[in-house]
Structure formats: structure tokens, C-alpha cells
Amino acid sequence: MSLSDPLGDMLTRIRNAYGRKKSSVSTPASRLRTRVLDVLKAEGYIRDYSQTDFDNGKSEIEIELKYFDGAPVVREIARVSKPGRRVYVSAKSIPHVANGLGIAILSTPKGVMADHEAREQNVGGEILCQIF
């Protein structure tokens, strides 16, 4: 099955798993997904993730979700830049998500990073998603 938005698919799987109170969720692996998960792990939105390679050349990522007192750590996770409508911002116009309580994940020339890192490095890029 071909997906038009693999990153959006991963975010939807995470959102649905949190809604069903699952402890983990799996998704096909890609470099972009792995880099986004690195940011989510560093910011404390997921517990961990691991990649499994199969004999047929494909690989899968198992994401361990994080809860605090039984409630999901992630309240809202949404794709911003979509295949039909890309959203680019300069370093000065990176939005503050939920008045600074959430993060935006950007794809920049210096790699995939959280919004506060992009502001520190004075680099703009494509807003991939927002997490609160």
C-alpha cells in the first residue's frame, strides 16, 4: 500500500494509540520518521522507540508511549505541513505552540529539530507537526 503522507500516518497511529491507552504502537520505518521520533524522545513526549529489520529488506519502528498518572503525555499531535500544502517559516516567524507549552518540529537545512532549537540556531524551515 502506498501512502501519500507517511509522516502523517505515523502521527495518526500515535494519536489513535494514545486514545486507546496502548503502551506501544508500530509503524513502518523511514529516516524522517526516525528523526522526528528522536525529537519526540528528547523532548519527553515518548518513552523510547526501537527499529526492527526484517529479512525482506523492510523495517518497522516500535514506539513506546508515555503516560503520566494514567493520562497521555501528548494531548494533541497534528500535522502542519501536508503534501498538498507545505508550510515554510523563517527563523523569526517560528510559532510558539500553546504559548510555549508545546513544540513544533521543523525540517531545516541543519536537520530535524524542535522549534526552540531552530530559534537558537537562527534557522527556519518546514513545520512538520505540532505537539501539545
From Swiss-Prot:
One of the protein's GO biological processes: translation
PROSITE patterns the record matches: RIBOSOMAL_S8
Span of the signal peptide: none
Family matches, as Gene3D superfamilies: 3.30.1370.30, 3.30.1490.10
Domain of life according to the entry: Bacteria
Gene Ontology annotations for the cellular component aspect, listed alphabetically: ribonucleoprotein complex; ribosome
Positions of transmembrane segments: none
A GO molecular-function descriptor: structural constituent of ribosome
InterPro entries reported in the protein's UniProt record: Ribosomal_uS8 (IPR000630), Ribosomal_uS8_CS (IPR047863), Ribosomal_uS8_sf (IPR035987)
Keyword annotations: Ribonucleoprotein, Ribosomal protein, RNA-binding, rRNA-binding
Matches recorded under Pfam families: Ribosomal_S8
Keyword Transferase: no
Family: Belongs to the universal ribosomal protein uS8 family.
Purpose: One of the primary rRNA binding proteins, it binds directly to 16S rRNA central domain where it helps coordinate assembly of the platform of the 30S subunit.
Subunit structure: Part of the 30S ribosomal subunit. Contacts proteins S5 and S12.
Name the record gives this protein: Small ribosomal subunit protein uS8
Record gene name: rpsH
